[in-house]
């Protein structure tokens, strides 16, 4: 399975840059393209000062374009996008496939004093559901937000899905590089699946400090090995993943087998 991460700062959909990267990915045989958080939309702090009608207009335009690009280039595009329903603003991750579009509504949102998405967005607080799972050419993906990677309960929902790759768009900042790398490699190893993480770049300046989004998009193997990563610049990362390697990792470590023996 050939996939790609497009590591960018916040982009308007009129950006020729975005179209050019899509064409390059298509020529390289990419089947799935992953974007980081707050690339199609302004950063969360900027969204807070925008009207719902403006966000809705922006989202409608973006969705139309992404559907067309997915169909034109026969490529699945996974992209976090802010949408509006009945004047309420929701944080979602969209999967634009050539023949269909699906949305995963983020279930656990960050809720700290300096960064409270849970308070701003209308995403319902309810019992956790299984994240979006789908296949491309027999290769099974699941997708969650970067913040949701912290929670064991999310992985409990995925434990019997036998996914090959977990897609994780993120918006990491504040020099958290080492912590995120440790978290991603550990999750990939203990669940014996690839993790492809797309993090945005750029910065946001508020009254108190500068939020630097440092990139470092990465691919980690089912054995917890860091296979490839980007720096802090605008880049396209093309990766190859193999279902056979996922199966081999599961058989080698036997984590799920050890638990299944003990399930009543």
Regions found by a protein language model. Give the residues of each.
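A conserved C-terminal secondary-structure "cap"
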Residues: 246-264
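Short beta-strand scaffold segments in enzyme catalytic cores
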Residues: 79-81, 91-95, 132-134, 197, ...
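Cys-nucleophile CN-hydrolase/nitrilase-fold catalytic domain and related Cys-dependent amidase chemistry
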Residues: 19-98, 102-106, 173-187
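Short, acidic/polar
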Residues: 14-24, 150-158
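Active-site catalytic loop in hydrolytic enzyme cores
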Residues: 84-161, 175-176, 248-254
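CN hydrolase (nitrilase-like) catalytic-core segments centered on the catalytic cysteine
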Residues: 55-78, 150-236
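Active-site-proximal beta-strand elements of phosphoester/diester hydrolases
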Residues: 1-12, 34, 105, 139-148, ...
């Amino acid at each position: 399975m050939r996939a790609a991460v497009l590591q960018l700062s916040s982009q308007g959909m009129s950006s020729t840059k975005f179209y050019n990267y899509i064409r390059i990915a298509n020529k390289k045989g990419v089947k799935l393209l992953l974007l980081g958080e707050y690339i199609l939309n302004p950063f969360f702090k900027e969204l807070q000062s925008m009207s719902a009608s403006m966000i809705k207009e922006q989202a409608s335009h973006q969705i139309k374009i992404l559907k067309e690009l997915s169909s034109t280039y026969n490529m699945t595009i996974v992209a976090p996008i802010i949408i509006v329903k009945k004047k309420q603003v929701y944080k979602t991750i969209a999967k634009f496939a050539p023949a269909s579009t699906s949305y995963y509504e983020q279930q656990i949102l960050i809720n700290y004093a300096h960064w409270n998405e849970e308070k701003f967005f209308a995403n319902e607080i309810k019992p956790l559901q299984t994240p979006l799972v789908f296949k491309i050419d027999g290769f099974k993906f699941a997708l969650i937000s970067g913040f949701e990677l912290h929670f064991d309960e999310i992985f409990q929902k995925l434990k019997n899905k036998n996914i090959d790759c977990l897609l994780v768009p993120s918006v990491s900042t504040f020099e958290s590089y080492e912590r995120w790398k440790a978290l991603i490699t550990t999750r990939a190893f203990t669940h014996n699946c690839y993790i492809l993480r797309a993090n945005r770049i750029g910065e946001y300046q508020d009254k108190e400090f500068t939020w630097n989004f440092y990139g470092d998009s990465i691919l980690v193997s089912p054995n917890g090995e860091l296979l490839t990563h980007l720096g802090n610049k605008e880049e396209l990362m093309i990766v190859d993943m193999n279902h056979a390697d996922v199966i081999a990792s599961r058989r080698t470590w036997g984590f799920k087998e050890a638990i299944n023996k003990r399930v009543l």
